Amino acid sequence: MSRVAKAPVVIPAGVEVKLNGQVITIKGKNGELTRTIHNAVEIQHADNQLTFAPRDGYADAWAQAGTTRSLLNAMVVGVTEGFTKKLQLVGVGYRASVKGNTVNLSVGYSHPVEHQLPAGITAECPTQTEILLKGADKQVIGQVAAELRAYRRPEPYKGKGIRYADEVVRIKEAKKK
């Protein structure tokens, strides 16, 4: 049985929560996020807290309640503080730049790679070899970071490629003669 669902999500000041059936909308200074809740989960909104309870008749109700609690907590953190993800470009001549909502990458192809950012996500390049993604939706930030990384994943012999800032690339030993 999940213990995650037993902890309530505290709603800070300045965050507005609307519960309409199984659709919840959380609005804060960084934007508005909406999510549809699984039928196995029942949510109560009282005195600046969201509490979760499983519904009878569902085998995975406690698991769904714990998952829902984690997702809604991430939504609350996203609309108040926001999320960031940092990518590094490692390799000779690998560069990144941001123009509007487009990330331009020079990562060893014969042409520059242009990646359109979805709504609600902003990117900046503190240096030519770093990309900083910011936004309110944790899932979308991770998805965009994974898409950018997929253009040139770190290779195991020299470590060249696009990597997450906290990623450790294991380097293989070269073949001996």
Swiss-Prot record:
Keywords recorded for this protein, A-Z: Ribonucleoprotein, Ribosomal protein, RNA-binding, rRNA-binding
GO biological process: cytoplasmic translation
Cellular component, GO, one term: cytosolic large ribosomal subunit
InterPro entries per the UniProt record, alphabetical: Ribosomal_uL6-like (IPR000702), Ribosomal_uL6-like_a/b-dom_sf (IPR036789), Ribosomal_uL6_a/b-dom (IPR020040), Ribosomal_uL6_bac-type (IPR019906), Ribosomal_uL6_CS (IPR002358)
Segments forming a coiled coil: none
Protein's UniProt keywords contain RNA-binding: yes
GO molecular function, one term: structural constituent of ribosome
Family annotation (NCBIfam families): L6_bact
Description of how the protein assembles with itself and partners: Part of the 50S ribosomal subunit.
Function per UniProt: This protein binds to the 23S rRNA, and is important in its secondary structure. It is located near the subunit interface in the base of the L7/L12 stalk, and near the tRNA binding site of the peptidyltransferase center.
Family of this protein: Belongs to the universal ribosomal protein uL6 family.
Designated name of the protein: Large ribosomal subunit protein uL6
Protein species of origin: Proteus mirabilis (strain HI4320)
Originating gene: rplF
